[in-house]
């Protein structure tokens, strides 16, 4: 059985003549350990889909089966537990708490998970060993995003969801963040899903899903993913 199964998922906003189909009969499967890129233009429906996968939103209809459990049937309380225990989130904007140090920001997230990783080890793994006691305002943008990734990883989630994680970063820093995510996926066998409008990064993925007009336009596996260092855009 696939780790993620999305079956006939639609997300519809509005009613009557004023209806928006953000997702329209979406279907795909993701195997355990895959690094998946969901790519599409702005407004294609990819962030809506990511929110549904992360339990931050629910589909109007359809099934979202993750690790053999259909979260589309979950109550709000069950979805809160799912997000807390199983999912890590990385967004374009870092959402760090300004009056906590980098280390404290990550520690705060790790405290909500019963199976969290050693925070100092995670900080070292993301290249922030010497920035533990710095506040967010003292960090560069790429460093702040590394804190956000460490915060997500420290929970030891089965699923790491990343919505335009390099959108606010320069080219060089963005590549370093993508390498960090690729290394995390391949070293831990965890599932990482990256939502992006940048189709040039598709070669780094094990699995590529293209979204347009709320529908899956293409769904393919990549038998030979490239290291991020070999990709240019």
Write out the residue ranges for each language-model feature.
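ABC family nucleotide-binding domain
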Residues: 2-211
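Conserved beta-strand-loop-alpha-helix hinge in the C-terminal portion
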Residues: 215-233
